[in-house]
Amino acid sequence: MLQVTPSQISGIIESGGVVAYPTEAVYGLGCDPDNDTAIQKLLAVKQRPWEKGLILIASSFDQLKPYIDLSRVTEAQLQAAFDKWPGPFTFVIPAKADVSPMLRGCFDTIAVRVSAHQDVRAMCYACQKPLVSTSANLAGEQPALTLAEVQTQLGDKIDAVVLGALGQSCQPSTIIDIQTGHIFRQG
């Protein structure tokens, strides 16, 4: 399995690759959110149905703007997200109409997070866009916590793994509906 630094992944992502990388709590799997073929590959690797949707991670809110429908979100709702970001909080926000169903799943919303993890931020900065993010594991299995676990579960099905350390969190991100405040998952 190819091992790269966060700044080296842009070419892999641009060519439709799927990479594993460290996040705040577990290893994640990512790809280009604007490439449906790459998203389909990621879903096949993970054995995850597209209908569930995926998360976008970013180094800044500006990277997320092309994917979210700001006309359906109030300033107060946005401020609630800004108060938590960067950090382990994912917000479910109305998606723009042209966002691929491969990202949204069967919803008109998209889950987004501005990460505080140094390597995630460096990857998004290098790619100049957010990345698709889901835990690095086969559906129904425990998320990978080590490079060895990534190798065991995903092996040669992915294009590269980003070298780096997991963050200090023991929990996945909290997922919150930005419009209602409903917590889908407590982190």
UniProtKB/Swiss-Prot annotation:
One of its GO terms (molecular function) is tRNA binding. It catalyses: L-threonine + hydrogencarbonate + ATP = L-threonylcarbamoyladenylate + diphosphate + H2O. InterPro entries: DHBP_synth_RibB-like_a/b_dom, Sua5-like_dom, TC-AMP_synthase, TC-AMP_synthase_SUA5. It is found in: Cytoplasm. Keywords: ATP-binding, Cytoplasm, Nucleotide-binding, Nucleotidyltransferase, Transferase, tRNA processing. It is an enzyme of class 2 (transferase). One of its GO terms (cellular component) is cytoplasm. It holds the Pfam family Sua5_yciO_yrdC. Residues 3-187 form the YrdC-like domain. It comes from the Bacteria. HAMAP family: TsaC (MF_01852). Required for the formation of a threonylcarbamoyl group on adenosine at position 37 (t(6)A37) in tRNAs that read codons beginning with adenine. Catalyzes the conversion of L-threonine, HCO(3)(-)/CO(2) and ATP to give threonylcarbamoyl-AMP (TC-AMP) as the acyladenylate intermediate, with the release of diphosphate. Belongs to the SUA5 family. TsaC subfamily. This is Threonylcarbamoyl-AMP synthase.
